[in-house]
Amino acid sequence: MGADSTINTTGLQESAGEGIKSSRLSICIVTYNASDWLVGCLDSIRENNQLESLEIIVVDNGSEDGIEELLSRDYPYVKFIGNKDNLGYTRPMNQGLQTAQGQYLMQLNPDTKILPGAIAKLIRYMDGHPEIGICGPKVLNRDGSFQKQCRRSEPRPLAMISYFLRLSSLFPNSKMLGGYLLEYEDVDATLEVDALSGSCMLIRREVVEEIGYLDEQFFAYQEDTDICSRARQAGWKVYYYPEAEIIHYGGQGGSRVEPYRSIIEWHRSYWLYYKKHLANDYFFLINWLYYLLMVVKLVLAVCINFLRQERYAGPKRG
């Protein structure tokens, strides 16, 4: 698996009246210098009194924040996999998923807070709907507002042009212009969708046994859309289930890299997804226009990031 060190642990045991049976759930978290956020995430899981037991696996990307010692001391039930370098998100998440023993596998970001009952609600909903292969909760921002990216359609040309030009915000009730983030749909409605956010996503084990794990061509973005797409192609359904809720603080996760690489990988992931799943649906001129759009947006994003750094340049933290 490419891991350097592992802590052998037992499962987390907590009693509850209507909990999840033992060995049914594995939660996999990738972290990179995010120990403060991870502690909050783990505490929110531990405080979720509707769980009887679960397996928690933390995969570290070469952090320098003492995370291994912290977990060994304060969270001895957590299984730890340590990498020497920052491998992004997809590869280390696969390390965790391939180690996991649970019937259900959950991808979870370290900068999240599980709200009461969320995990149990997701599992009960999937238990009652065996056709669902992947399910995700309602994701909230730190201020309690809805995080629109938690449920999405595929990044098709018109949807993405509308998204990039912010037409979806101007015409949120339009299925044509508001399609990528499904802005015309009720945020409190259970909904079959094309894709969910990897910040919190519950996957049935049979899905990865059938279609494989995350595609490691994706460094850190659109890997969630890709696995959802492959699941749908295999006949599984993907559902957004807002009865379960989490908070995602954002930007403090496990794959943080230099800003320019992050920008490049973000745009590359859209190009890769389009080439892999959508290009055959369109005439080649449409495809080249889409690729050109991505290049133009990439150049603009790099320039904007450079100008922001110049504008806000100041003393660095020592």
Regions inferred by a protein language model and the residue ranges of each:
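Short, acidic, metal-binding catalytic loop of nucleotide-sugar glycosyltransferases
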Residues: 43-53
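Glycine-rich, basic loop-to-helix element that forms the pyrophosphate-binding segment
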Residues: 83-100, 121
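A short, conserved alpha-helix in the catalytic core of glycosyltransferases
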Residues: 186-245
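Active-site-adjacent helix/loop segment of glycosyltransferases
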Residues: 229-310
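Short aromatic/hydrophobic "clamp" motif used to bind/position activated sugar donors
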Residues: 105
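Conserved donor NDP-sugar-binding/catalytic core segment of glycosyltransferases
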Residues: 115-149
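Short, flexible, basic/aromatic active-site loop/helix in glycosyltransferases
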Residues: 154-193
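A conserved acidic beta->alpha catalytic loop
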Residues: 44, 60-68, 85
